[in-house]
């Protein structure tokens, strides 16, 4: 069985407390408010269990209460927010059951995707992935963990897009939203970011060899690391998890 590093004393990543500007998102005002709140929750800028104060959010974003309330309702439907009558609105704590289910769905989709892509990947697609890995390495060297996290996600998104199935990413985003948030917890663990880059390089090597089985094996190893690292964090940070 894979063993994580012994040090789990580091605090989970907490991003900048400010919400991202609405101008960074497209769509209606309501959708923009939803997106910036969603990103704040996924990035752990809003900590699990933290109360969401709508007046403060309205003031920071410069919007009325209506789009904020609508956004909170959407987030509650996704399981990212808990609305407790007469008590308040809170960022949902992590649920290991939901994370395990999301990890199962993620593996089912991404293993099939990587195997399919390895059979037909083009040189242009390989160049795009190499470029992404180069930036990942640079961000790791700079100690930019949030930036690395973003490029990590973009690499997986590229691989899914290379399947040619246009609906796959939307399905993926919905199916493992809790996994995406949980990944933020494991990146600060000593050595985890460097190990992630090494795993990405192994995936890349299998794709360059156009070896579907090797690509599948490398992706499986990479994906299964999450729970290996996350379970000890549940013990060391119980306040972030549902009992």
What is each PLM-predicted segment?
Residues 1-119, 124-125, 161, 216, ...:
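Short linear motifs at protein or domain termini
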Residues 102, 123-184, 198-206, 214-225:
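Conserved amphipathic alpha-helical segments that form helical-bundle/coiled-coil interaction surfaces
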Residues 63, 191, 210:
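Residue-level signal for the nucleotide or nucleotide-sugar donor/cofactor binding architecture
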Residues 189, 212-218, 238:
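Hydrophobic/aromatic-rich alpha-helical bundle segments in the mid-to-C-terminal region
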Residues 41, 117, 140, 207-210:
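Hydrophobic residues in alpha-helical segments
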Residues 28, 126-127, 191-194:
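Short helix-capping and inter-helix turn/linker motifs at the boundaries of alpha-helical repeat units
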Residues 167, 179-183, 187-190, 227-234, ...:
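Short amphipathic alpha-helical interaction/hinge segments
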Residues 86, 109, 131, 195-198:
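Alpha-helix N-cap/N′ positions at the starts of helices
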């Amino acid at each position: 069985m894979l063993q994580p590093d012994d040090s789990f004393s580091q605090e989970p990543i907490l991003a900048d407390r400010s919400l991202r500007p609405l101008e960074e998102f497209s769509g209606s005002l309501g959708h923009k408010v939803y997106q910036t709140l969603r990103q704040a929750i996924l990035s752990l800028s809003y900590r699990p269990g933290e109360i969401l104060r709508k007046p403060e959010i309205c003031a920071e974003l410069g919007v009325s209460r209506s789009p904020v309330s609508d956004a909170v309702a959407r987030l509650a439907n996704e399981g990212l927010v808990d609305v407790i009558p007469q008590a308040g609105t809170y960022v949902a704590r992590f649920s290991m059951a939901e994370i395990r289910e999301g990890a199962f769905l993620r593996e089912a989709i991404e293993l099939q995707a990587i195997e399919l892509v390895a059979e037909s990947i083009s040189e242009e697609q390989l160049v795009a992935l190499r470029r992404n890995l180069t930036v990942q390495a640079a961000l790791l060297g700079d100690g930019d963990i949030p930036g690395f996290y973003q490029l990590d996600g973009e690499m997986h998104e590229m691989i899914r897009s290379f399947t040619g199935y246009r609906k796959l990413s939307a399905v993926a985003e919905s199916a493992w939203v809790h996994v995406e948030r949980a990944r933020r917890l494991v990146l600060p663990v000593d050595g985890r970011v460097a190990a992630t880059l090494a795993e990405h390089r192994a995936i890349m090597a299998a794709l360059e060899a156009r070896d579907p089985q090797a690509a599948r094996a490398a992706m499986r190893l990479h994906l299964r690391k999450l729970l290996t690292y996350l379970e000890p964090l549940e013990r060391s940070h119980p306040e972030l998890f549902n009992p």
